[in-house]
Regions:
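Central cavity-lining transmembrane alpha-helices of secondary-active solute carriers
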Residues: 60-78
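Core transmembrane helices of Major Facilitator Superfamily
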Residues: 119-131
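Glycine-rich segments within core transmembrane alpha-helices of 12-TM secondary carriers
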Residues: 148-171
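Helix-breaking motifs and short loop linkers at transmembrane-helix boundaries and internal kinks
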Residues: 85, 106-111
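Pair of pore-lining "gating" transmembrane helices in MFS-fold secondary transporters
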Residues: 9-46
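Paired small-residue
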Residues: 100, 111-119
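Primarily marks hydrophobic transmembrane alpha-helices of the MFS/SLC 12-helix fold
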Residues: 87-90
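C-terminal ends and interior cores of transmembrane alpha-helices
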Residues: 95-108
Length: 177
């Protein structure tokens, strides 16, 4: 018997738990990927003491570098997920994103910031590729549109939640001293 989540029919071999875990990952992963951009101004201002007049250039360069890394590596992670499975690539991506996210606030120079953002970018490429693959793997053909829509809504919700939470952290840290 085919599993369902509400009106969404899942492909053979995909359990409701698999789908629920994936949908949770849509909120968390995309929220974290976007979340780095919400804490970056605080790190540039307070941790690295970069003048506001230079922060746009640094932020743009960091974003550009992350996109280049994504363009170069995302197809590699797609192929890798076909060869070794979605789970190992997703676990790798999650661990590497966590490492980059954890190191990012400890950067003492702009060069370190670029190194830590590169680490984050590699994990982000792995996560992004697997999330895009699974959204097509899990539903049946008849339910694909509904599942993609739910995936997109949860991505947006994740960004909003993390923006609200992480966007307040600089104020909290500043008030603490």
């Amino acid at each position: 018997m085919q599993a369902k989540i509400g009106p969404i029919r899942l492909s053979e071999g995909v359990s409701r738990f698999n789908a629920a875990t994936y949908l949770y990952a849509c909120i968390i992963c995309i929220g974290i990927l976007a979340g780095l951009n919400f804490i970056q101004p605080y790190i540039l201002s307070v941790v690295l003491d970069i003048p506001r007049s230079e922060q746009g250039s640094v932020s743009g360069s960091l974003a550009f570098m992350q996109e280049i890394i994504a363009i170069i590596s995302i197809s590699l992670f797609g192929v890798l997920s076909d060869r070794i499975g979605r789970r190992p690539v997703m676990v790798f991506g999650t661990m590497v994103v966590a490492l980059g996210f954890a190191l990012f606030p400890y950067a003492t120079t702009i060069n370190e910031l670029f190194i830590y953002r590169s680490i984050f970018a590699i994990g982000a490429a792995a996560l992004s590729s697997v999330l895009a693959i699974i959204v097509n793997d899990y539903p049946t053909e008849q339910s694909r549109g509904k599942f993609v829509s739910l995936h997109s809504v949860l991505n947006a919700l994740g960004v909003a939640i993390f923006a609200a939470f992480l966007g307040r952290l600089p104020t909290v840290f500043t008030n603490i001293g």
